[in-house]
């Protein structure tokens, strides 16, 4: 990197020197030897040539400055590329759980503690629901498997899908614990789950909910504590998440645990009118 920077600087200096030499070579030989008249004044021809020389000097200076700026810009771009490479290398140390939760569309997920996942009691019954269970669990915990090279590319994709499913099922259990509720509380305060689209709820923050605890039965929805209704998430990426990864219990247990966050039920409702007259409700 340092050698490349040195080369850029030397090239610009060589170009500048060539330009200066060309300017000197192109100067007329008689410009500096114009005769002075008897009154001791420089002739008009010599004045014009002097101005031309001054203009040539200024152009050579501006050319050298522009070349220097170009070399500086190359140095800056090299520095930026170094910083981007450093940031990329830092990202390689990210755990699988952090990587998964930071994926686009996975904003509803919180990071499950490794200690919780390593406790077999918390994973009871999941081995029969998730294919490639052991390999998926190793992938979640960043444990290198000795059989990784034996799998085909298709099998590796299946293991990755199984890891996402297993993490989702673990996540549904974790968010019902005190630690999990606290993690979801932070996301709730940051409006990570979105706001209620209903006008009279005035932007009430929502909570994720599943309509079934069985995987692949339905996608995740958002529950509004104010109007007590469920809605589709606004993001199409979040709309593809399995609702079983959050379960049917979470939002209600959350509001029971943090009762002070439960808002008053919305009192206003939309009134239907035709030409200003309210419609009669049968």
Curated annotation (Swiss-Prot):
Record's signal peptide: none
Compartment(s): Cytoplasm, Cytosol; Nucleus
Segments for region (Disordered): 1-92
Single Gene Ontology MF annotation: protein kinase regulator activity
Bias kind Polar residues: ranges: 29-47, 61-71
Organism superkingdom: Eukaryota
Record bears the keyword Transport: no
Bias kind Acidic residues: ranges: 75-92
InterPro entries recorded: Casein_kin_II_reg-sub_N, Casein_kinase_II_beta-like, Casein_kinase_II_reg-sub
Post-translational modification: Phosphorylated by alpha subunit.
Keywords assigned: Cytoplasm, Nucleus, Phosphoprotein
GO cellular component entries: cytosol; nucleus; protein kinase CK2 complex
Keyword Magnesium part of the UniProt annotation: no
Functional description taken from the UniProt entry: Plays a complex role in regulating the basal catalytic activity of the alpha subunit. The tetrameric holoenzyme CK2, composed of two alpha and two beta subunits, phosphorylates the transcription factor PIF1 after an exposure to light, resulting in a proteasome-dependent degradation of PIF1 and promotion of photomorphogenesis. CK2 phosphorylates translation initiation factors. May participate in the regulation of the initiation of translation.
The family this protein is said to belong to: Belongs to the casein kinase 2 subunit beta family.
Subunit structure: Heterotetramer of two catalytic alpha subunits and two regulatory beta subunits. Interacts with CCA1.
Protein's UniProt name: Casein kinase II subunit beta-2
Species, as recorded: Arabidopsis thaliana (Mouse-ear cress)
Source lineage: Eukaryota, Viridiplantae, Streptophyta, Embryophyta, Tracheophyta
Designated gene of the protein: CKB2
């Amino acid at each position: 990197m340092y050698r490349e920077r040195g080369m850029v600087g030397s090239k610009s200096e060589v170009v500048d020197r060539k330009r200066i030499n060309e300017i000197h070579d192109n100067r007329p030989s008689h410009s500096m030897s114009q005769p002075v008249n008897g009154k001791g004044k420089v002739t008009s021809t010599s004045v014009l040539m002097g101005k031309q020389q001054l203009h040539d000097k200024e152009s050579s200076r501006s050319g050298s400055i522009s070349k220097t700026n170009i070399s500086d810009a190359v140095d800056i771009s090299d520095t930026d590329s170094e910083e981007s490479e450093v940031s990329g290398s830092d990202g390689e140390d990210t755990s699988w759980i952090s990587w998964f939760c930071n994926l686009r569309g996975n904003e509803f997920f919180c990071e499950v503690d490794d200690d919780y996942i390593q406790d077999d009691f918390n994973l009871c019954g999941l081995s029969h629901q998730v294919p490639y269970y052991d390999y998926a669990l190793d992938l979640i915990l960043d444990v290198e498997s000795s059989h990784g090279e034996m799998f085909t590319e298709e099998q590796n994709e299946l293991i990755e899908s199984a890891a996402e499913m297993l993490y989702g099922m673990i996540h549904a259990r974790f968010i019902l614990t005190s630690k999990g509720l606290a993690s979801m509380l932070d996301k709730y305060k940051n409006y990570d789950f979105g706001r209620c689209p209903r006008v009279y709820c005035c932007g009430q923050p929502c909570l994720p909910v599943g309509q079934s605890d069985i995987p692949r039965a339905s996608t995740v929805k958002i529950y509004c504590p104010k109007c007590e209704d469920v809605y589709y998430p606004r993001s199409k990426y979040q709309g593809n998440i399995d609702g079983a990864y959050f379960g049917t219990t979470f939002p209600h247990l959350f509001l029971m645990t943090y009762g002070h966050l439960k808002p008053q039920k919305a009192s206003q409702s939309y009134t239907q009118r035709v030409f200003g007259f309210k419609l009669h409700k049968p």
